[in-house]
From Swiss-Prot:
Pathway: Protein biosynthesis; polypeptide chain elongation
GO biological process, one term: mitochondrial translational elongation
Gene name of the record: MEF1
Database matches in SMART domains: EFG_C (SM00838), EFG_IV (SM00889)
Protein's name according to its UniProt entry: Elongation factor G, mitochondrial
Organism field: Cryptococcus neoformans var. neoformans serotype D (strain B-3501A)
Keyword terms of this UniProt record: Elongation factor, GTP-binding, Mitochondrion, Nucleotide-binding, Protein biosynthesis, Transit peptide
InterPro entries per UniProt: EFG_II, EFG_III, EFG_III/V, EFG_IV, EFG_V, EFG_V-like, EFTu-like_2, G_TR_CS
PANTHER family for the chain: ELONGATION FACTOR G, MITOCHONDRIAL
Length: 811
């Protein structure tokens, strides 16, 4: 490195903002939602123990939902001081060998195939079975019959396994080198998640409770639409991740192009920690460029790992080049390594490995592994990487809130100590053979079979009759589960996102983000309605927060809503298979919305006199556009600015209720209203005639009066569509997207195929699957995910408004 380059690097480091500096310099708590999407939220340095005196100054508010404004308010108020529990030596030893990991990716990247190999190499299953049930068995984690038929994961599945790996880099003692220590046994909880966007809630709730993740990418397709969604979800919950480039044996595989996409499309500081030996069909193994060793899988199923210092000459230059690149990229994320790099000091494999662990845990860096799960290559080194670089439960600072304090009160750090008061989060519900199965992450304390626990939301005290650890659809009964573990309970009635305690605290945890449905359709049984029809709908609603059911007030039809056509099709099929209820469905309906584009004032009086006590309520204020809150997902709000009491306090909730009722049905097309804030400034009441009904109706009338003055528009869901097809069909594919009024965002050509990314209204995408198959001779495929709601064209809005008006007049 030249003197000029060294000087420039030092200046760059000095001029870096706090959010860009390596983590060891950054000690302030950071709220995740204050960061832009492309910036990695921070976590505290591993140098800060969860039990150290400096912990309260350095902890990251991982699950805090309060805003930065709330922090300012907290300085002016005095909050109760709490003595944090302390980890015992037994706790520390147990937690150092614990990992909670999710496996996520775009559909068909090989997540379930990878998980199957992980289970085989860790000894959890005796043989390897393939996705789609080609061998009449199917992958272990795809336990549902529909999953094996369609070859996709529909529900997330949990399991646990033990893996023997070298000691993590941060635990190395004087004289020890990375990878050459006595091996330790690690306990790994694994959740395999769906890759299809329609089942995104499964990814959402898995990442909510995990400490780390493996982001799987296809060596050919690279970063795809759902990869971007999964990355966004990982950032939302501050989940450190490793990347695994799978399918290295496929024709056209190019791992370094994929790493370029990680940096470009995901704004991720990523670099390879391995390089491939051979390519495509000649892919034979990898070179670990941290330790500069060649690694091969031998044996029929890749059981035997062979490590050697003899790196093939064909890849030696590449390995040295990528090692230099790794050190340079990693130096931007870790100050210790940066100093060695700038001083041109010798950098050992241990220096690199320790920097990787610090930078990965702090969300500053993503190590990239590579292999081929289907060819049983590169999976064991990935498991070693999970144990070496991803955090254990004591290195992730989770937060709870005290339900007895205001929402802006400081959050309480949870310590994964066994003897601490119990705090756990129910993150997934499932109807099992023996009743409701509730998946739980224990954050603090110990959960015992037969113990009494409290639901923080309902206040109810319930008994835990049975406690199990899950292995896909199999269960292993246990007597107790301690902090840092994932388990399941039978016979406990609750909802997804509920917090459970032992009753000694009033703690509650924030739930997971639940996206709004984008598509609906009517549904009815083929014959007479049976109890099973309602039973199935109730169960599916309870299990899946993105699956909604309501009865249309006009047609009296039962309407189901979800994240896409496949999402709803799966539930219709499950009703037939699991409840013996064949259903007839109507044409899919798009989830249109209405909103306002500017603020409008109202001064509305509701007055009714018909003898005796009447109704009187006057409200003054405004409605204004509102952006979606990135933390809660809410895009409507009610704000009371009344000072003095012109409207008695007991009537304020009625006004808020009236506002919520008015949102249910828009005035242009009858669709729900979104993106709107109701501000109450003033009003008046009558000593006799004012009541809750009067103010509720006044709020509805005021909202409707102001809505028409606020330049309302109709919104429609717009999807990000990604199409992959042979290059000879590019013109036809682009023409079809233009025909559907789509906006082309990006095109990429590689070898003999191309990828097109476009934004198209969901209402214009019906029937596209058949059209694409026809125009590409069955060789094209596409995926789409919800992007946002955007205004429809003015002429479309006019047609929709006219149709709605005629429908109203015909009643």
């Amino acid at each position: 490195m030249s003197a000029i380059a060294r000087a420039a690097a030092r200046v760059r480091q000095q001029n870096t903002t706090p959010l860009q500096r390596p983590l060891l310099l950054q000690r302030k708590p950071v709220l995740t939602h204050t960061l832009p999407l492309h910036a990695s939220p921070l976590k505290p340095s591993l140098a800060t123990s969860i039990t150290s005196p400096n912990f309260q100054q350095s902890f990251q508010r991982r699950w805090a939902s309060a805003s930065a404004k709330a922090e300012e308010g907290a300085k002016e108020e005095v909050w109760p001081q709490r003595k944090l529990p302390e980890l015992t030596e037994t706790d520390k030893l147990r937690l150092r060998r614990q990992r909670n990991v999710g496996i996520s990716a775009h559909i068909d990247s090989g997540k379930t195939t990878l998980t199957e190999r992980v289970l085989y190499y860790t000894g959890r299953i005796r043989d390897i079975h393939e996705v789609r049930g080609r061998d009449a068995v199917g992958a272990k984690m795809d336990s549902m019959e529909l999953e094996r038929e369609k070859g996709i994961t529909i529900q997330s599945a949990a399991t646990f396994a033990d893996w023997v790996a070298p000691k993590p880099p941060t635990e190395l003692k004087e004289g020890e080198t990375v990878g050459n220590t006595d091996k330790q046994k690690f306990a790994i909880n694994i959740i395999d998640t769906p890759g299809h966007v329609d089942f995104t809630i499964e990814v959402e709730r898995a990442l909510r409770v995990l400490d780390g993740a493996v982001l799987v990418l296809c060596a050919v397709s690279g970063v795809q639409s759902q990869t971007i969604t999964v990355d966004r979800q990982m950032r939302r919950y501050n989940v450190p991740r490793l990347a695994f480039i799978n399918k290295m044996d496929r024709a056209g595989s190019n791992p370094f192009r994929v790493i370029g996409q990680l940096r470009g499309k995901l704004k991720m500081n990523a670099a390879a920690v391995q390089v491939p030996i051979g390519s495509e069909s000649d892919f034979a193994g990898v070179v670990d460029i941290v330790r500069m060793k060649a690694i091969y899988n031998e044996g029929v199923k890749g059981n035997q790992i062979v490590e050697t210092d003899e790196i093939p000459e064909s890849v030696r230059a590449l390995a040295e080049e990528k090692r230099a690149e790794l050190i340079e990229q990693l130096s931007e994320a870790d100050e210790t390594l940066c100093d060695l790099f700038l001083d041109e000091a010798p950098i050992t494999p241990t220096d690199i490995a320790q920097a990787l662990q610090r930078a990965t845990t702090s969300l500053r860096f993503t190590p990239v592994f590579m292999g081929s799960a289907i060819k049983n290559t590169g999976v064991q080194p990935l498991l070693d990487g999970v144990c070496a670089y991803l955090p254990n439960p004591s290195e992730v600072q989770n937060q709870a809130m005290d339900a007895t304090l205001p929402a802006h009160a400081p959050t309480i750090p949870l310590v994964p100590a066994t003897d601490a008061p119990l705090v756990g989060l129910a993150f997934k519900l499932e109807e099992g053979r023996y009743g409701q199965l509730t998946y739980m992450r224990v954050y603090q304390g110990e959960l015992k079979r037969g113990s009494m626990i409290y639901n923080a939301r309902t206040g109810k005290r319930v008994k835990v009759p049975r406690l199990v650890r899950m292995h896909a659809d199999e269960m292993e009964d246990v007597d107790a589960v301690v902090a840092g573990e994932i388990c399941a309970m039978f016979g406990v009635e609750c909802s997804s996102g509920d917090t459970f305690t032992d009753g000694s605290s009033t703690y509650t945890m924030t739930s997971m983000f639940v996206p709004e449905p984008v598509i609906s359709l009517s549904i009815r049984p083929e014959g007479n309605e049976t109890p099973n029809f309602s039973r199935a709908l109730n169960r599916f609603q309870k299990e899946d927060p993105t699956f909604r059911v309501h009865v249309d007030s006009e047609s009296q039809e039962t309407i189901i809503s979800g994240m896409g056509e496949l999402h709803l099709d799966i539930y219709v099929e499950r009703m037939k298979r699991e409840y013996n209820v064949a259903c007839v469905t109507g044409k899919p309906r798009v989830a249109f919305r209405e909103t306002i584009t500017e603020a409008a004032k109202f001064n509305y009086t509701h007055k009714k006199q018909s003898g005796g006590s009447g109704q009187f309520g006057r409200v003054i204020g405004s409605i204004e556009p509102m952006e979606t809150d990135p933390d809660t997902g809410k895009d409507t709000a009610f704000e009371n600015r009344i000072i003095g009491g012109n409207i008695p306090n007991q009537f304020i909730p009625a006004i808020q209720k009236g506002f919520q009722e008015a949102l249910d049905r828009g005035l242009i097309t009858g669709h729900p209203i979104t993106g709107c804030k109701f501000v109450l400034d003033d009003g008046s009441a009558h000593a006799v005639d004012s009541n809750e009904l009067a103010f509720r109706l006044a709020a509805i009338g005021a909202f409707r009066e102001a809505f028409n003055k606020a330049r309302p528009v109709v919104l429609e869901p717009v999807m990000t569509v990604e199409i992959v097809a042979p290059i000879e069909f590019q013109g036809n594919v682009i023409g079809a997207i233009n025909q559907r009024k789509g906006t082309i965002v990006d095109t990429e050509v590689r070898d003999d195929e191309f990828t097109l990314t476009a934004e198209v209204a969901l209402n214009d995408m019906f029937g596209y699957s058949s059209q694409l198959r026809g125009m590409t001779q069955g060789k094209g495929e596409f995926s789409m995910e919800y992007k946002n709601h955007q205004p429809v064209l003015p002429n479309i809005q006019k047609e929709m408004a006219e149709a709605f008006r005629k429908k109203q007049l015909s009643k």
